[in-house]
């Protein structure tokens, strides 16, 4: 993994910082595990914008990732690491002993030729997946399930991890990167180690066009709009004289947005700022 700063041959290249990983596969992805990914432009079936700042971008294939890791007690070998345009983490193509291939999230320290395994008897080793009741307290894990059998939902982006800090009865207590501590059933499956490509946060795109390649459209400030378009719009000068709000009038500084009361009892400590 190398961090490369580009030479300032133009204004668009001057600030570019790239993450170069020579271990990544340079050929095409594994075709049977590709899916069609159609663009919406942020619009719903009525043609109305439901998510702003989406549109354009390079055509992409979706890589079908195995978040469930439910091929139990069958050893697999890592064939290669690959780039995935749909996520910040890299992915690994693994070949199981029965001949099936699957994509998984590539943990930090995993490389081509390594062996991995899933199941309750899997050893505590990077890339192995097993129920958290069989993982020692203090271990670092990723791709953590919230419901048994549903597949990993927590800690899937580049550099993400969760620490198991306690085990009581049928539950384990996890400490998330945000500072939140929550309980999860010990039957839920997690993968040992942290997600790789943690240098992703250091990259600098360098120009607006690089964001457009990724399908991200510009974000216009509310104060630069007219009163019809945003609560902050209009007026002479830059002051809007009220608390900052979203375009729909909802407070935007510190207002709590969580509404899932049903699972509040599993949160031991809320995330910090």
From Swiss-Prot:
Keyword DNA damage: no
PROSITE patterns attached to this UniProt entry: RIBOSOMAL_L2
Gene3D superfamilies referenced in this protein's UniProt entry, alphabetically: 2.30.30.30, Nucleic acid-binding proteins, Ribosomal protein L2, domain 3
GO biological process terms on file: cytoplasmic translation
Presence of keyword Ribonucleoprotein: yes
SUPFAM superfamilies on file: Nucleic acid-binding proteins, Translation proteins SH3-like domain
Biased composition range(s): Basic residues: 253-263
Domain of life: Bacteria
CC terms in the record's Gene Ontology section: large ribosomal subunit
Keywords tagged on the record: Ribonucleoprotein, Ribosomal protein, RNA-binding, rRNA-binding
Gene Ontology MF: a single term: rRNA binding
Listed InterPro entries: NA-bd_OB-fold, Rib_uL2_dom2, Ribosomal_uL2, Ribosomal_uL2_bac/org-type, Ribosomal_uL2_C, Ribosomal_uL2_CS, Ribosomal_uL2_dom3, Ribosomal_uL2_RNA-bd_dom
Signal peptide coordinates: none
UniProt-annotated stretches for the region Disordered: 221-263
Family designation: Belongs to the universal ribosomal protein uL2 family.
PANTHER family, alphabetized: LARGE RIBOSOMAL SUBUNIT PROTEIN UL2M, RIBOSOMAL PROTEIN L2
Job description of the protein: One of the primary rRNA binding proteins. Required for association of the 30S and 50S subunits to form the 70S ribosome, for tRNA binding and peptide bond formation. It has been suggested to have peptidyltransferase activity; this is somewhat controversial. Makes several contacts with the 16S rRNA in the 70S ribosome.
Record HAMAP family: Ribosomal_uL2_B
Quaternary assembly: Part of the 50S ribosomal subunit. Forms a bridge to the 30S subunit in the 70S ribosome.
Protein name, as recorded: Large ribosomal subunit protein uL2
Gene name as annotated: rplB
């Amino acid at each position: 993994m190398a961090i490369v700063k580009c030479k300032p041959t133009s204004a668009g290249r001057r600030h570019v910082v790239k993450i170069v990983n020579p271990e990544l596969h340079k050929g095409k992805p594994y075709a049977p595990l590709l899916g069609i990914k159609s663009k919406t432009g942020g619009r719903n079936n009525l043609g109305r914008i439901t998510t702003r700042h989406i549109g354009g971008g390079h055509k992409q294939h979706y890589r079908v990732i195995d978040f469930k890791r439910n091929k139990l007690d069958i050893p697999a070998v890592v064939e290669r690491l690959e780039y995935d345009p749909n996520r910040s983490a890299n992915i690994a193509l693994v070949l199981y002993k029965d001949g099936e291939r699957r994509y998984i999230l590539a943990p930090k320290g995993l490389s081509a030729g390594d062996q991995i395994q899933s199941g309750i008897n899997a050893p505590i080793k990077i890339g192995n997946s097993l129920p958290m009741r069989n993982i020692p307290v203090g271990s670092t894990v990723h791709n953590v399930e919230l419901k048994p059998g549903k597949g990993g939902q927590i800690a899937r982006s580049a550099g993400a991890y969760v620490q198991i800090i306690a085990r009581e009865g049928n539950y384990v207590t996890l400490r998330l990167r945000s500072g939140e501590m929550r309980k999860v059933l010990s039957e839920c499956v997690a993968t040992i180690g942290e997600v790789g490509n943690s240098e992703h946060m250091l990259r600098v795109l360098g120009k607006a066009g690089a964001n457009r390649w990724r399908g991200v459209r510009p974000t216009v400030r509310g104060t630069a709009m007219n009163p019809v378009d945003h609560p902050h719009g209009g007026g002479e000068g830059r002051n809007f004289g009220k608390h900052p709000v979203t375009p729909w009038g909802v407070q935007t500084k510190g207002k709590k947005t969580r509404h899932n009361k049903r699972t509040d009892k599993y949160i031991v400590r809320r995330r910090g700022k």
